[in-house]
Amino acid sequence: MSSKQATSPFACAADGEDAMTQDLTSREKEEGSDQHVASHLPLHPIMHNKPHSEELPTLVNTIQQDADWDSVLSSQQRMESENNKLCSLYSFRNTSTSPHKPDEGSRDREIMTSVTFGTPERRKGSLADVVDTLKQKKLEEMTRTEQEDPSCMEKLLSKDWKEKMERLNTSELLGEIKGTPESLAEKERQLSTMITQLISLREQLLAAHDEQKKLAASQIEKQRQQMDLARQQQEQIARQQQQLLQQQHKINLLQQQIQVQGHMPPLMIPIFPHDQRTLAAAAAAQQGFLFPPGITYKPGDNYPVQFIPSTMAAAAASGLSPLQLQQLYAAQLASMQVSPGAKMPSTPQPPNTAGTVSPTGIKNEKRGTSPVTQVKDEAAAQPLNLSSRPKTAEPVKSPTSPTQNLFPASKTSPVNLPNKSSIPSPIGGSLGRGSSLDILSSLNSPALFGDQDTVMKAIQEARKMREQIQREQQQQQPHGVDGKLSSINNMGLNNCRNEKERTRFENLGPQLTGKSNEDGKLGPGVIDLTRPEDAEGSKAMNGSAAKLQQYYCWPTGGATVAEARVYRDARGRASSEPHIKRPMNAFMVWAKDERRKILQAFPDMHNSNISKILGSRWKSMSNQEKQPYYEEQARLSKIHLEKYPNYKYKPRPKRTCIVDGKKLRIGEYKQLMRSRRQEMRQFFTVGQQPQIPITTGTGVVYPGAITMATTTPSPQMTSDCSSTSASPEPSLPVIQSTYGMKTDGGSLAGNEMINGEDEMEMYDDYEDDPKSDYSSENEAPEAVSAN
């Protein structure tokens, strides 16, 4: 080492100095105005003798003062470039085999210092070289320090990096929070939408709350109204109960009066259950609908007889209807009649010799004891047949009638009262306005006594009498009208009490003459029950003739016979033309057996209700179920067409009814009667009525309760006609139609079933059914009924 120092150290130094000089000159030209050299020149004397431990903090402080990250990087790059230049300057040192030593370094520094201070130019270049050398050393030391303690630089860099990253993150976050104008507008729109929805929700809640309040208030109001209504109903019920008690008290008083006035003769009025819809009691009473002695009668006058107070009070108290009150009145009058004929029921009354007798009266007297007189009471057991016109006048019952044993032989019995009657029976009703009621023929013997055999026997006898009458009429054809008036004697002509009454009866002949037909039949109001087709009508009432379906009329002044009766015109064919029944349709074929089944299960069911049941069943049936009946209909139609090739159906027009001057159809009339009955029921007691047993002269008791509404009766009825199947009303209308009565062909009164007999008749005569196109031509219309 010493040898090296001894051997030409300056030569090397000179060579190196020349190289350094050239290098510095070129560097000065390149960098020109580099400020780093000038800035570091004053530090050289101080830093030259300082140890490395003092130089590192100085460098660190210098680096820390640089706040900009880019300036730090640029300075590092410049230091690296200077380091490269210095490496070329001191490359000779790296060629030595010995490591660089500190003493050698110091010696070199001394040499360089001495050389540098030689001239100003060299001094300037030496200072720059020294600075570069120091920088290189510092970089080497920093590299070693970083390797020894890497956290130092990481701390330095991480602090600045973290600050920058924090600044970047904060700005981004602020940008996201602040947002763009579009996002802000969208958010504002969403907020406004939410506010609007909240406002609408609030309004809905308020409205629902108000509705709940209103609903609660309305419910409270309804409850209050219901409570008020219930209270009013209770008060009304209490008033009605009070009225019922008062009426019951009045009834009790009337019953006491009846008991006090017990000297009145008993009434022979059979009482029947109201649901049978019969007027048998009415017929029995009306046979005694007579006038007291001394009271004359003119056809245009009303009955001048007033009710007997005690009897009528008893009837009103017992719940009788207006018709039944009229019947009671008739029976009471009959019981008060006193005549010689009443005491001799088995012998004919002698002719009245007072006054002159017309030839008609003489002929009638000659036939006074004819067997024809037996017909009346037997035919009276049959219902009226309104669909046909009689061929003969209807005689009344004679005292010698074989059916007289059907009734008790009592002095006050209404059946025996025709013997003492001075008023004509239904035949007179067809001859003059002042006739008695034609309900005389509606007496229902089976309903009275339940003896159907007796009724059938009477029917057969009536047929025989009818044949005998026809034979006698054929013998008396030259006498004309005299033959038609053969039964006048039986109407009480010989029982007239004075000549004035006889004269009135004789004057009935011209009236009959004006209304008689050429074929020996009377006017349209006369019905002959002695004909087989008329008598067979009794079988139409469910086999027992328990339900009468005929019309009756009250005799009033100013009403003619034609107005007070049902009459029909011919349907385009002569009276002698035979009636051809229509073939049954499918419904009739099916209903034939079904109706029988229903009647077997419910014998008392009304025909209209049965028809409704059958109609609803038929509509509910399927076409497959109806097919066999349609086939049967086709077969029957084919047979009918072969039998009657020229048959043409001629329907009769609908019946009409005149009420208070208005022309009503039957359905309208029924509705009117219903409303009138309903109005009447509102004024009278409704409920259980006391039973009044009626005892006849022979001790026969007819128990039963009269449950019909009571009313104040009047003997003068203001209208002309009604139906026995409906409850009687004070105003009884006129039944009128535009077709005549049939002359032949058996028909059924009403539309009732025949208990297995003559179903074909029943179905042909079925008028009320919707399938009425297949009903019979000679059917009897269903009686006017509100039931």
From Swiss-Prot:
GO cellular component terms, A-Z: cytoplasm; nucleus
InterPro entries with a match to the protein in the record: HMG_box_dom (IPR009071), HMG_box_dom_sf (IPR036910), SOX/SOX-like_TF (IPR051356)
The organism's place on the tree of life at top rank: Eukaryota
Membrane spanning stretches: none
Biased composition (Polar residues): 352-361, 398-420, 712-740
Coiled coil regions, renumbered to chain: 184-262
Modified residues (Phosphoserine): 358, 398, 401
PROSITE patterns from the UniProt entry: HMG_BOX_2
Assembly: Homodimer. Interacts with DAZAP2. May interact with CENPK.
Protein name: Transcription factor SOX-6
Organism listed in the record: Pongo abelii (Sumatran orangutan)
